[in-house]
Regions:
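Enzymes that bind and transform nitrogen-containing heteroaromatic metabolites
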Residues: 11-200
Length: 200
């Protein structure tokens, strides 16, 4: 693998696509059997790469649990004592719209956020088509709905150098997709990034 800035530049020029991007283990999980994901925490180099992937994103799609985690970025990354990479991510997150899918939440706690009761593939397709920026899927649950509906244009995985043996899989069982490699990159801490276009 090698660094591919050209891969990111071509990504940044393609707008209005639905992207699914995760940090996961080599054996395909976003968390382990106990729900832990400390092993997936990026260092500064990986975090900077994730920030670059965020720059074309105009809207985030979340389920309830991931939204509860990510909502912390409304205040995280706002202190001058935090690293430049952390502040950059916070600014990118706060600058994007969010859609939260939940049947149990009564309200959302962050600006630029709306609540939807169900994931409607036709509505998501229309959202992406009307957007001049990319839309990012957050979490395997929403991703399964979108993948099975044929909505996803790109899948990105930052692979952590760990095998966890079980947990929440980032791809659903029984799904077959043909992919085209867009970018591969490796990092000093042993993480590796892969981005694929969904072609069929």
């Amino acid at each position: 693998m090698g660094n591919s800035h050209r891969g990111f530049e071509s990504h940044a020029l393609r707008m209005g696509r639905l992207v699914y991007s995760v940090i996961g283990s080599l054996d395909g999980y976003v968390d382990d059997a106990e729900g832990g994901f400390a092993w997936a925490m990026p260092d500064e180099e990986v975090h900077a790469y994730v920030n670059d992937l965020m720059r074309p994103i105009g809207t985030h799609l979340y389920g309830r649990r991931l939204y509860a985690v990510m909502a912390g970025w409304q205040t995280l990354g706002t202190s001058p004592d935090e690293s430049a990479v952390t502040r950059d991510f916070g600014e990118l997150w706060r600058g994007a719209d969010k859609v939260v899918y939940s049947t149990t939440l009564d309200e959302v706690s962050t600006p630029r956020t709306r609540l939807e009761r169900s994931f409607d593939p036709d509505a998501v397709r229309a959202l992406v088509a009307a957007s001049d920026r990319d839309v990012l899927l957050g979490g395997p649950g929403l991703a399964e709905h979108a993948l099975r509906a044929g909505l996803v244009d790109e899948i990105g995985v930052v692979v952590a150098p760990v095998v966890v043996g079980g947990g929440t899989a980032y791809l659903p069982d029984g799904l077959r997709l043909d992919l085209r490699l867009l970018e591969e990159r490796r990092f000093a801490n042993g993480f590796a990034a892969l981005r694929y276009a969904v072609v069929g």
